[in-house]
Amino acid sequence: MKSAQEDEYLEFVATRAKALYRSAYVLAAGDTHLAEDLVQETLSRVYVHWKRVAGADSPAAYAQTVLVRTFLSLRRRRSTGERPIGNLPDGAASGPDTALRLTLLDALGQLPPRDRAVLLLRYWEDRSIEETARMLRLSSSAVRSQGTRALGRVRALLGDSLSDLVPH
């Protein structure tokens, strides 16, 4: 890669890596190691195609699409691979917000990967149904039905006390 292109890529990484990590963290249901792996793999793939990516309408949207597809691909492959036996505490501050965040991440972690991706794109990233469908290679009606089903599942997992936090 030429020096100017490398500089562009490094600037892109500096501005987008945190947002990609936040999305990866939600997709990974709080698994920080998986989130870091997803971001690293995404940025590696973007780097390989940087000349084309830099000329795209939205390199950030391209990277987000790569992130989601990498997550879904990894989930398909890991179904027979390693199995985590639990998470060690981060040592992060605890409190009501932390407990709520962990409860929500646990509920998201119990969803199938594609449902989790639909919820991430629709409600975390605030993407349209059409944009979500394009990123996941689904029809718009599939995004609507999977989103509705996933929200219902999250409501059921959260129980009566927290289900009002889930969008309708």
Give residue spans per PLM region.
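Short helix-coil-helix linker/hinge
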Residues: T98, L108-R116
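A short pre-motif secondary-structure segment
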Residues: V118-R122
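Short, basic, alpha-helical segments at the C-terminal edge of helix-turn-helix-like DNA-binding modules
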Residues: D160-H168
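Arg/Lys-rich amphipathic alpha helix in sigma70-family domain 2
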Residues: V48-G55, T65-G86, P96-D97
